[in-house]
Every structure is written in C-alpha cells, then in structure tokens.
C-alpha cells in the first residue's frame, strides 16, 4: 500500500467522514489500492450513514447497478430520494428518471415532470433532454411540442458548448 492510501486510511479509522468516503472512491476506481467492489460499497455505505451527501447519492447508484451489493431498486430509490431531500441538487434529475420509469417506486409521470423541471431550474443540462421528452409526449404535463423543441435545442446548444 502506498503512503497516500495509508494516510487516508488512518484518517478514516479516526472517523473522518471525507476520508471514509475517499477510501470508498479509492476502492471503486483502484486509486492507491486495487479495485474492490465490496470494499468500495462498505466505505461508501459507512460515509452515507454518517451523512456524506455524495456518498448517499453513490449508494443509490451502487444499489441500482448491484455494485458491491445485491441489486435493489427500492433501496436505490430510497437513497436517491434521501440525497435530494438533504440538498444534493445533482441527484434531482435521476430521481425524476426513477419516477418516470418506475425504478424502485411506482411509476409517476407527474412527479418525474416535477423533478425534471426542478433540475432544469437549477441548471442541470441533462434534465433539459428529459423535460423536453415530457413536453413532447405529454408525460406528467399537457403536450407542448413547441416547448419540447425549445428545450431540445437548448440541450443541444449546451452540449455543443460543453464539448468545444
């Protein structure tokens, strides 16, 4: 093990939540350590239980994809919603997607629309595409093709500017 990993481990053993989270990320990506899904899950779950917002959102992803743990869409939804409730704005769009497709929760296009709109209102670029689709198909709202095309154009414009 290298010195950076040992330093992070020492802080984690002392209860430093950011270090605990860091160990989870280290194990997930093989940074300073070998990749290890189970250890990544262990430390991300521990950080999440200590209130680390990004860890809570990551735990939702782990449960959704069965990363280091048995796949469980209901637990994934629980942690995604918890991340949003605790202020993790980056988790809002994904919560909308879970409502739209009934992932871990009963399908609810109205709530999906609500969360996509909320995500767009705070500047989430990906949410523009989902919200456009809602307006196009009338999911959770009255169909509005003009609004859908406007949002789709804005999404394409923002993606183009991000990639240049």
Kindly give the residue locations of the regions a language model identified.
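Hydrophobic face of amphipathic alpha-helices that form TPR/SEL1-like repeat modules
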Residues: 20-29, 33, 56-65, 69, ...
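TPR/TPR-like (Sel1-like) alpha-helical repeat modules
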Residues: 129, 133-137, 142-160
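Canonical positions in the second alpha-helix
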Residues: 11, 46-47, 83, 118-119, ...
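N-terminal segments that cap or nucleate solenoid repeat domains
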Residues: 1-30
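Short coil/turn and helix-start
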Residues: 13, 31-35, 49, 65-71, ...
